[in-house]
A protein has these predicted regions:
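Alpha-helical segment of the N-proximal tetratricopeptide repeat
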Residues: 445-479, 490-493, 497, 561
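Residue-level recognition of tetratricopeptide repeat
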Residues: 448, 483-484, 518, 552, ...
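Conserved alpha-helical positions within TPR/SEL1-like repeat arrays
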Residues: 489-493, 520-530, 554-564, 587-597, ...
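Hydrophobic alpha-helical membrane-insertion segments, chiefly the h-region
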Residues: 4-21
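Primarily the internal scaffold of c-type cytochrome electron-transfer domains
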Residues: 30-31, 36, 55-132, 138, ...
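Structural signature of tandem alpha-helical TPR/SEL1-like repeats
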Residues: 465-472, 497-510, 531-544, 565-578, ...
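Terminal, low-structured helical/coil segments at or just beyond the last alpha-helical repeat
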Residues: 700, 734, 740-771
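Structural marker of alpha-solenoid helical repeat scaffolds
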Residues: 479-480, 514, 548, 581-582, ...
């Protein structure tokens, strides 16, 4: 009897269960509806301004704001040499270069693959350049669906010009060619663009279908210029012409500052959130002269909070000039006299020696007498480089290759080297700030619904203060019953993130009842239903979402995952293929490959996994899945390459280690396979699957008693583990202990896994015949 049972156990070792992990649903996106018109809001082509304000127009065009966004040309991409050096990024083992072909510009990435040749090649055309070059230039690509994505390599002004990765990219698994430019990004880096109607909804897709402005224009600080231009062209009186436009210098000090603070008050660029645009406001609806708090609310870390580098109180980030200025005693005690425009003429920036004289002259208006007195007593240098000592240049915490003037006016210059190189901190959901989020601006927001609701949302929006935020947001919603659906969606998301899906699900349902045509709400409800084991209902909801937005790749992906859960593989494959046609999303390709792998369609699974890796080379799941395909196809050495890549990327990836062990067993490297499984059990002794696999490997090496112990441990950890019952039953029967084998084989025969159930029934049948 031993011959066939031993063969059964060996099949379990060599074939095994193919493990793979399907990813979470992709980020939200939305079909672009009809565009809203800037002209209807009173905006005009900013070039009209030049007809009356030619001098200001010419000087402003040379400022950083005037050059903030542009078309690619030789000078702002690869330089006059028509070539750029290849940049090697060690953490991701990737090579990047900038290319020019026939007057068009591209950014290219490649890696060195298993065969020593270039692999994972990605090349995208540069459609736009963001940044003036005073500090940094980044490069954007516009997709066929009018999304803007940031390309990984940037050009920094430091060291006379140098190439380095964009902020947030200096680590192994960076965003690659997939970082989407949001409306929040565009708000501060360019003039207002045309955007789809309904763009203010949380989770709405960020698409830019029209012609984009080239640089921050006059109307960002002066408001829509249509009425002003019309009045001037019609010969209206000077007073009427002036009244038709916002002149920031005629606003109150508070409103004047807010014109600048709409973009220069960023409390932090790391996960917090730093600001929330009020629900119901579209992303480009702020108008100079209105209270900034009517458009957005600004938030900050709680005072005294510890940061990885010390304290968040002293954070110095690239878009926080006004944030730092507001800390200064000079500002706080000026009574509104010290504004951004006290030092800065936004229309014309002084340069070189003229700049030093200008800024020092501004300081002298208040401090001249005191400085002379201190200099006479030997307590102050005779020279008056005010800025160099009291507002020194400093390397920014968030863009570590950029050096900026610190607008915190200090009595004494810090003693440390402010320009010393900094390593980029890699902030994730797992290691980000965990603490209270406080309202920063406007500080005088009165108690009531706005304060309570938005402050509660700030706690949960990026998981900074999840438990307390859930309590506060629940109470605020119960108290005020707000109209905007987004409050309910935020609460549902927070409950989901806190592992309370049972409580989240009815709130997602409520959000959809409030806005039945909200694509983000429908998709999130679909995800929640799937997580709650209701794929049929989820499919119904997701089909409603696709009726609204048939070209939404994320919804097609989620639909496919529900079909997988239902066991409807052909429908799942069709949904995933549709999603791949719409978005270049590695998770979609991995999901497609996974269901093809489950269907034993290795020929089609392999290119799907390779495409997932090409898009995201540091995708551990896709490497492991490709390793499974290659191992099953008899290409062990290449399979080993991908399994080891998966484990380098994620050393704690249990499924990859187990799959690697199975691949080693397929080529009779049982000792190596055993070491892999033992390493997994060392880090996770409670992994029942690993104990079962180790038992199979021990059987293959003739170590029957230790194998039985491993099967027993697997069953102890998971009493209903059908595969372990099958393996132990087969081993006992093979050893002649049929009585001991029968209970385990009978348990396996009742397994919900069809393969385990069929093997157990077959074995029981053979045992019956043998007896």
């Amino acid at each position: 009897m031993r011959w066939w049972l031993a063969g059964l156990v060996l099949v379990a070792v060599l074939a095994g269960v193919i493990y793979f992990t399907r990813p979470r649903s992709a980020a939200t996106s939305q079909e672009a509806p009809q565009q809203a018109s800037l002209s209807s809001a009173g905006y005009v082509d900013p070039a009209i301004c030049a007809s009356c304000h030619a001098d200001v127009w010419e000087t402003y065009r040379r400022t950083g704001m005037g050059r903030s966004f542009s078309q690619p040309v030789l000078s702002n991409t690869i330089g006059d040499n028509k070539s750029a050096p290849t940049f090697y990024h060690k953490p991701s083992e990737s090579y990047f270069t900038m290319l020019e072909r026939d007057g068009r510009f591209y950014q290219r990435r490649y890696q060195i693959g298993f065969d020593g040749k270039e692999t994972n090649i990605m090349e995208k055309e540069i459609d736009f350049v963001v940044g003036s070059g005073n500090h940094v230039r980044a490069y954007l690509h516009r997709t066929s669906r009018n999304k803007l994505v940031e390309l990984p390599l940037a050009r920094y002004a430091e060291k006379g010009g140098s190439w380095a990765m964009n902020p947030g990219y200096d680590h192994q698994d960076h965003p690659g060619f997939s970082r989407t430019i949001t409306y929040g990004c565009m708000f501060c880096h360019n003039g207002f663009p045309e955007v789809p109607a309904g763009s203010g909804e949380a989770g709405a897709d960020t698409v830019f279908p029209g012609r984009l402005p080239e640089g921050i224009d006059c109307q960002r600080c002066h408001g829509p210029g249509g009425k002003h231009a019309q009045a001037a062209e019609s010969g209206a009186k000077p007073g009427e012409i002036r009244k038709a436009i916002v002149n920031p210098s005629r606003l109150s000090p508070e409103r004047q500052m807010e014109v600048c603070m709409q973009c220069h008050l960023e409390t932090t660029s790391s996960r917090l959130p730093n600001s929330i645009v009020r629900y119901g406001r579209s992303p480009f609806s702020y108008r100079p002269g209105e209270p900034l708090g009517d458009f957005m609310l600004q938030f900050d870390h709680a005072p005294g909070s510890a940061s990885p580098g010390g304290s968040y109180d002293d954070k110095f980030e690239i878009a926080g000039a006004a944030y730092r200025l507001r800390r200064s005693e000079c500002f706080q005690k000026s009574g509104g006299a010290l504004l951004c425009t006290t030092c800065h003429n936004p229309h014309d920036i002084p340069r070189g020696g003229e700049a030093a004289r200008h800024y020092n002259g501004v300081c002298s208006q208040c401090h001249d007498a005191a400085v002379k007195q201190l200099a006479a007593s030997g307590k102050h240098p005779q020279s008056t480089d005010c800025i160099g000592c009291h507002m020194p240049k400093r390397r920014t915490d968030d863009v570590v290759h950029a050096v900026m003037t610190d607008h915190y006016i200090q009595r004494r210059k810090p003693e440390r080297d402010l320009l010393a190189p900094l390593a980029e901190s890699h902030v994730t959901e797992d290691n980000g700030y965990r603490g209270e989020v406080v309202l920063y601006y406007p500080q005088d927001l009165p108690n009531g619904s706005d304060r309570e609701l938005y402050l509660a949302v700030a706690q949960v929006n990026q998981k900074s203060n999840l438990s307390a935020g859930i309590t506060a947001l629940t109470a605020a919603i119960d108290k005020y019953r707000p109209g905007p659906m987004q409050f309910y969606l935020e609460l549902a998301d927070a409950l989901r993130d806190n592992g309370q899906m049972t409580k989240a699900l009815p709130i997602y349902e409520d959000a959809v009842r409030r806005e039945p045509n909200s694509l983000p709400a429908l998709r999130k409800l679909g995800v929640a239903l799937r997580s709650s084991g209701q794929p049929s209902r989820a499919i119904e909801i997701l089909k409603r979402a696709l009726d609204l937005a048939p070209a939404d790749g994320a919804t097609w992906h989620e639909l496919g995952l529900n079909y997988v859960d239902q066991g409807s593989k052909p429908e799942a494959i069709a949904a995933f293929q549709k999603a791949t046609e719409l978005d270049e999303d590695p998770e979609v390709y991995n999901s497609l490959g996974a269901v093809l792998l489950e269907s034993a369609d290795l020929a089609r699974a392999e290119p799907a996994f390779r495409e997932a890796i090409r898009i995201r080379p540091a995708y551990a799941e896709a490497h492991s899945n490709l390793g499974n395909v290659l191992s099953a196809s008899g290409r062990f050495e290449e399979a080993r390459y991908h399994f080891e890549a998966a484990l380098r990327l994620n050393p704690n990836y249990a499924a990859a280690r187990q799959n690697y062990a199975l691949a080693l067993a397929r080529v009779n490297r049982f000792e190596e396979a055993q070491r892999q499984v033992e390493a997994e059990l060392k880090s996770d002794p409670g992994n029942a699957v690993a104990h079962d696999l180790l038992g199979n490997l021990l059987v293959a090496r003739g170590q029957v008693k230790p194998a039985a112990s491993q099967y027993q441990e697997a069953i102890k950890l998971r009493p209903e583990f059908g595969r372990a019952h099958l393996d132990l039953g087969a081993l006992l029967a093979d050893s002649g202990d049929v009585a001991g084998a029968l209970p385990h084989l009978q348990k396996a025969a009742a397994s919900p896994e069809p393969g385990v159930r069929e093997e157990a029934l077959q074995t029981l049948g053979l045992l019956g015949k043998a007896r």
